């Protein structure tokens, strides 16, 4: 019997410390074949982790999972503008990295950190590979912002 194949789409992945690392390990322990599409590690400080740069590496193996990394603008300095650029760049580069993936997926999991537009590459992958997409949403942004700040502007609330 052929192993089930799953694609995990997430901006943040090992060596960054996120729960998705454990989830991928669980999939592997259950006998699934796992590919991960992710960015280059630079969270939370905004600096590339040792061994990484804007030039890669683009392919790795994490405990048996095939890791495909794509470009992103780092959060360098964690200023509002850099974080915004990071939020916009990763889904765009990830979307245009789908051609590098082998396909044949039975399912796609989007580990969706904020903002919600991070799910765009996973939805595009679902369409391209004709596979169902599930999204694990960790932060409903900017809705969580409105829960702590008194934003009353109807236009801003409508955009959210």
What residues fall within each predicted segment?
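N-terminal subdomain of nucleotide-sugar transferases
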Residues: 1-61
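Structural motif
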Residues: 5, 106-107
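Acceptor-binding helix/loop patch of EC 2.4 sugar-transfer enzymes
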Residues: 11, 74-82, 129-160
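Surface-exposed, flexible loop/turn segments at secondary-structure boundaries
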Residues: 14, 42-44, 75, 116, ...
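An aromatic- and histidine-rich active-site surface loop
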Residues: 17, 84-95, 107-129, 135-144
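Short, glycine/charged-enriched secondary-structure capping and boundary segments
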Residues: 21-24, 49-52, 83, 122-126, ...
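Short, well-ordered alpha-helices that flank and scaffold nucleotide-derived cofactor binding pockets
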Residues: 25, 29, 96, 100, ...
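A conserved catalytic-core segment of Leloir-type glycosyltransferases
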Residues: 38-98, 102
């Amino acid at each position: 019997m052929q192993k089930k194949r799953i694609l995990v789409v997430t901006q943040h992945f090992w060596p960054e410390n996120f729960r998705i690392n454990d989830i991928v390990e669980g999939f592997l322990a259950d006998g699934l074949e796992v590919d991960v599409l992710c960015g280059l590690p630079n969270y939370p400080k905004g600096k590339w982790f040792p061994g990484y740069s804007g030039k890669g590496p683009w392919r790795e193996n994490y405990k048996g999972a095939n890791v495909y990394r794509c470009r992103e603008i780092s959060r360098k300095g964690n200023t509002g503008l850099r974080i915004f650029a990071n939020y916009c760049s990763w889904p765009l580069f990830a979307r245009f990295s789908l051609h590098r993936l082998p396909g044949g997926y039975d399912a796609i999991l989007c580990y969706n950190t904020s903002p919600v537009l991070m799910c765009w590459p996973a939805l595009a992958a679902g369409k391209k590979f004709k596979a169902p997409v599930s999204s694990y949403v960790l932060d409903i942004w900017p809705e969580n912002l409105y829960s702590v700040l008194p934003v009353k502007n109807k236009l801003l609330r409508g955009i959210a």
